[in-house]
C-alpha cells in the first residue's frame, strides 16, 4: 500500500471550515485510477475547481500521472472466475479500501465520500463516516443484479437476492446518487426509493478538448481497405462473442474480406474472445492489441470506418458509443432504449440479439461512404452539444456544493443550539 501526490489545485474552502480546503474521497471498487476514465474525469474536474482529492483504488503505475490527487493504492487481488473466487477477490478489495479509508480520515481528513463499483458493498465503508457528518455519494454506473443475470443467466438464488438487498441498502445509505443516464435515475427513484431530488444524472462522455482527431495510421488496417473498431473493457456484459459471430457471418457467409476488425482493450473475457476467433476461423481478420493508452486508443478511432457496440443491456449508456461519436465514427449497435436515446441517427440498429442483422448493417455501412460521413457528423454534433464531459461537469460539481453547504448549515445549527 502506498500513497503519492502531485501538485495541489486551487484552494476551495470546506463548508465545515472556511479556512481549510474541502477534500473529497473517491473510492472505486477493484479497479485503478489509470484504467477508470470516468474517475479520471471526476478527479480532474474536482481539482480544477479547487477541491482536494483523495483516491483509493488498485495499484497501477499509471496512477501516478494525475497531478493534484493523492492516490492511496492497494495490491490487486488475483482475478477470479468462480463465485467463491469473486468473494475472495472483492473481499480483499473491501478490506483494503476500508483500512485505507480509516487511515485517510485520520491523517488527511475528508469532507465527503464517493463510492463506485459493483457489487454494492462499499456503502458499509461510508456509513460510519456519515455518523461523523461526512455525506456519502453513490456514483452508480451499473446495476449489480442485472450484471449477475448477464454473467450467470439467472434471476434467483441466494446470491441474486443478496445483491438486491445490497443495492437497496446502498440506496438507503447514500446522501445523493449520481447515475449515468435517465434509466438508472428511474431505477434509483422506483426500485431504490431514493427521495425526490436526490439523484443527479452525470453522463460519461469524453472531454471535448481531448477528442481532436489523430492522424490515421493505415497500418492499423492490416493491409485491408476498411477498419472496424471495438474499444473498451472486456467483460461478459460487453458481448464480444456476439461481435465475433457477426464478423464470422460477414466474412464466411457474406464473403466480405476487405475489412480488418480491431478489439482494443483488456479484461476477463479477452482470452476467451481470442479463442473464439480461432474456432470461428476469423483470426486473420481480427486483432486484439490489448490495453491502449488514450492517444493510441483515439488513433484507432481516428483511423476506423465503423465502430462496433454489441452490448445487449437495455438500460446501459454505451461509453463506446460516446467515444465513437466524439470522433465522428458511425457505429452499429442493437436497438436498445438507452443506446438509441444516446446516439439517435449516429448509429445503425439491429434487432437485439440478431447476429445476422448486425453483420448485414456493417456490410451496408462499409459500402456507403456518404451515409457514414453523415452519421459521423450527427454523432459529433450530439457529442459536443449534449454528451461531452464538459456538459456534465456543472451537475457533478453541484452535487458537492449542495452537500457541503448542507453540512455547513447543520454544523451552524448545532452550534446555535
Language-model-detected regions and their locations in the chain:
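N-terminal subdomain of nucleotide-sugar transferases
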Residues: 2-67
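Conserved donor-binding/catalytic core segment of Leloir-type glycosyltransferases
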Residues: 25, 178, 219-247, 262
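Membrane-proximal helix-turn-helix segments that form the acceptor-binding/catalytic region
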Residues: 44, 102, 124, 128-132, ...
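An aromatic- and histidine-rich active-site surface loop
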Residues: 94-97, 110-133, 137-147, 184
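Acidic donor-binding loop of glycosyltransferase active sites
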Residues: 175, 298-316, 329
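Carbohydrate-associated surface elements
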Residues: 183, 205
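Nucleotide-activated donor-binding/catalytic signature segment of Leloir-type glycosyltransferases, i.e.
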Residues: 271-292
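Conserved acidic donor-binding segment of nucleotide-sugar-dependent glycosyltransferases
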Residues: 347-356, 364-370
Amino acid at each position: 500500500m502506498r500513497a503519492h501526490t502531485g501538485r495541489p489545485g486551487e484552494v476551495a474552502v470546506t463548508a465545515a471550515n472556511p479556512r481549510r480546503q474541502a477534500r473529497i474521497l473517491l473510492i472505486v471498487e477493484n479497479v485503478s485510477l489509470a484504467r477508470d476514465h470516468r474517475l479520471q474525469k471526476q478527479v480532474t474536474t474536482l481539482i480544477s475547481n479547487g477541491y482536494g482529492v483523495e483516491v483509493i483504488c488498485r495499484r497501477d503505475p499509471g496512477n501516478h500521472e494525475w497531478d493534484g490527487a493523492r492516490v492511496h493504492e492497494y495490491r490487486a487481488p488475483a482475478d477470479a472466475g468462480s463465485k467463491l473466487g469473486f468473494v475472495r477477490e472483492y473481499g480483499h478489495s473491501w478490506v483494503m479500501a476500508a483500512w485505507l479509508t480509516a487511515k485517510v480520515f485520520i491523517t488527511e481528513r475528508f469532507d465527503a465520500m464517493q463510492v463506485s463499483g459493483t457489487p454494492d458493498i462499499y456503502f458499509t465503508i461510508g456509513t460510519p463516516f456519515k455518523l461523523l457528518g461526512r455525506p456519502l455519494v453513490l456514483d452508480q454506473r451499473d446495476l449489480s443484479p442485472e450484471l449477475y443475470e448477464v454473467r450467470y443467466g439467472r434471476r434467483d438464488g441466494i446470491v441474486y437476492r443478496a445483491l438486491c438487498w445490497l443495492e437497496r441498502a446502498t440506496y438507503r445509505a447514500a446522501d445523493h446518487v449520481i447515475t449515468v443516464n435517465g434509466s438508472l435515475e428511474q431505477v434509483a427513484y422506483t426500485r431504490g426509493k431514493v427521495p425526490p431530488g436526490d439523484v443527479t444524472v452525470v453522463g460519461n462522455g469524453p472531454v471535448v478538448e481531448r477528442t481532436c482527431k489523430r492522424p490515421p495510421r493505415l497500418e492499423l488496417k492490416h493491409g485491408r481497405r476498411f477498419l472496424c473498431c471495438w474499444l473498451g473493457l472486456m467483460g461478459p456484459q460487453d458481448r464480444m462473442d456476439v461481435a465475433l459471430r457477426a464478423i464470422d457471418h460477414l466474412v464466411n457467409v457474406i464473403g466480405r474480406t476487405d475489412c480488418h476488425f480491431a478489439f482494443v482493450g483488456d479484461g476477463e473475457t479477452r482470452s476467451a474472445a481470442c479463442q473464439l476467433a480461432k474456432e470461428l476461423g476469423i483470426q486473420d481478420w481480427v486483432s486484439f492489441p490489448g490495453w491502449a493508452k488514450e492517444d493510441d486508443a483515439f488513433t484507432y478511432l481516428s483511423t476506423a470506418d465503423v465502430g462496433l457496440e454489441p452490448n445487449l443491456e437495455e438500460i446501459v449508456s454505451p461509453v463506446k458509443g460516446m467515444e465513437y461519436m466524439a470522433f465522428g465514427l458511425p457505429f452499429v449497435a442493437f436497438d436498445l432504449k438507452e443506446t438509441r436515446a444516446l446516439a439517435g441517427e449516429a448509429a445503425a440498429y439491429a434487432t437485439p440479439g440478431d447476429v445476422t442483422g448486425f453483420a448485414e448493417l456493417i456490410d451496408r455501412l462499409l459500402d456507403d461512404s456518404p451515409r457514414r460521413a453523415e452519421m459521423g457528423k450527427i454523432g459529433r454534433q450530439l457529442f459536443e452539444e449534449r454528451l461531452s464531459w464538459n456538459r456534465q461537469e456543472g451537475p457533478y460539481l453541484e452535487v458537492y456544493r449542495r452537500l457541503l453547504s448542507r453540512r455547513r448549515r447543520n454544523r451552524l445549527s448545532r452550534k446555535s443550539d
